[in-house]
């Protein structure tokens, strides 16, 4: 009976760990980014999937294309920085002189832009891979980076 209980606990742990792993772009899309053109809706699907897995990611639709495709940005931050996102934003405006006052935080905002022209696919492919790297909660180096900055 103890062996059966132990086996069940071990199976639950292994399955729970496997489920908790973030799918890579290749696993999600069925091909490695850059090997094929990724349609816009699949990129949005992947960003939404990753954001649903990680509470430290916020997706914002800031507009749409002429073809009514959503234009989105992803905000990645540590839990502490995500909780004070508005303060960090206004402090950055104060540092640039766009708002008056003295900043109370020293957290920079790192804006990463990938696409300038809609018909150039390399930016979207790079964005998908970079987003996965930055969103992976098991990447200790990135988690350390996110303590010191907000990435958009």
Spans of features found by a protein language model:
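Bacterial N-terminal signal peptides
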Residues: 7-17
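Positively charged n-region of N-terminal signal peptides that target proteins for export
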Residues: 1-4
